[in-house]
Amino acid sequence: MREAIQLAHSALYITSPNPRVACLIVRDGRVVGKGCTQAAGQDHAEVQAIKDAKARMPAAALRGATFYVTLEPCSHYGRTPPCVDAVIACQPAQVVIAMRDPNPLVAGRSITKMQQAGIEVRSGILAEEALALNPGFISRMVTKRPWLRSKIACSMDAKVALADGESKWITAAAARADGQHWRARSCVVLTGIGTVLADDPLLNVRAVETPRQPIRAVIDRRFIIDEKAALFNGDPVWLFVEDRALTAAEQQKEARLVQEKNARLIKIPLSDRHGASEALDLRAVMAYLADNEINEVHLEAGPRLNAAFLEANLMDEVLMYMAPKIIGPGREAFALSPLQRLSEARQMVFFEQQLVGTDIRLSARDAQRWQAMLAAISE
């Protein structure tokens, strides 16, 4: 199973909105077929592995084999036929599954179907490692929203910029290059209008070989983005704006952006948190993304938007690149209100630490949410 999980990593950038899945077929102690899920609408991992095995040996030789799959095979018709039927047709003796699929269209049905066909099924093998491959897909199935990961580059004293806003560059080139991988695996790279106006970023994937670019999205309540912004380079851009009637000038601006810049304007209601309606409802933003089959959201934003997602309890993971620098007075990663008691602090759990060049990459996540997803795939 560990080998199958490693194989699934080769599909890290291409499967969305489907999960990243790999399958190994083992016969007489050796791997005779392998495959991983391709782009949406193409073969899933099980079908790829079966085709690979049949290219090496007679189809009848698959009878009695063992299938190792990182996710329960699908049991429904979508862009492709059900994989469980292809597996059953091979008449394996055993199917070993890393995790159950919480998708309501599957949800254990494939396991039951294989057992009814006389196949021994084992599940829950390296489930947490398999979950780490697909936090976005599992989150969308279990919590009805994508997995949101905030990427932060900071100094040892947790400053993301000088007091005047200068931030290029706190971290070194190796850390910045490593960050491209996390953009590439995401479905959406999200930022706020403040970052766009201050830095004019591209927010695209560079220095990583990938067949697709994630959608770039901007929280822009007042719809003040410059039509000449660098991120309008032909690839899709989604703009989340306040749900209100646009002025005539704004309507013309929207038409130009849609027709000439491949942009989409998405109207979102204002938040009513704490009785104030000054910002977009970020839960509505996340619901829209989930409805559009977005699995992983990569947030690269300033202190205020970081704080807004954290306070809305929507930040699932923090990816922090810490440079061995001490800045002193400067801008914090989160523009949070002061706490009255330490017990009010938002608690996350570190799960990975990695030296990247001269900097350190720290990864922390919401442990409660992670455990809820782990429980859903282990039932």
Task: Show the residue positions of the predicted features.
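Short, basic/aromatic recognition patches
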Residues: M1-S16, R140
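Residue-level signal for inorganic ion chemistry
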Residues: A4, A22, C74, M114, ...
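Short beta-strand scaffold segments in enzyme catalytic cores
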Residues: V21-G29, I152-A153, L362
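Zn2+-dependent cytidine deaminase-like catalytic core
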Residues: I25-R27, V31-E129, A245, A308-L310
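Short gly/pro/ser/thr-enriched loop/turn and capping motifs at secondary-structure boundaries
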Residues: P102-L105, E128-E129, L197, I224-D226, ...
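Active-site ligand-binding patch in enzyme domains
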Residues: S139, T143-N295, R304-A307, W370, ...
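Flexible, gly/pro- and Lys/Arg-enriched active-site loops
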Residues: E311-M348
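Conserved histidine-centered catalytic loops in small-molecule metabolism enzymes
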Residues: S337-E379
